[in-house]
Amino acid sequence: MSERLVNHIREERARLGLTQADLATMAQVSRKTINTVENGVFIPSTVLALRLARALGTNVESLFQIPDAGRPDSVGP
């Protein structure tokens, strides 16, 4: 079963005034990796999710959620 993963990386990055390149440097990955994660093309590893959270000054749970299965438009806890 494939679950959809919602992420808030773009919003957090924009809130901090960072470009994809800035975040990529901070997380030690390529800008393309940031782009593919933001667009839901690539689901990050645990290590990458932790690096992104650290770079954005937040926690993984704030960046990534699995939508509630009962309500497709909602985000679970």
Placement of each model-derived feature along the sequence:
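A short, Lys/Arg-rich alpha-helix, primarily the initiator
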Residues: 1-15
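Residue-level signal for the short linker/turn that defines the boundary of a DNA-recognition helix
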Residues: 7, 17-18, 44-47
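Alpha-helical residues within the helix-turn-helix
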Residues: 14, 25, 54
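Short alpha-helical DNA-recognition segment
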Residues: 17-35
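DNA major-groove recognition helix of helix-turn-helix/homeodomain DNA-binding modules
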Residues: 28, 47-62
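Short, charged recognition helix plus adjacent turn
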Residues: 64-77
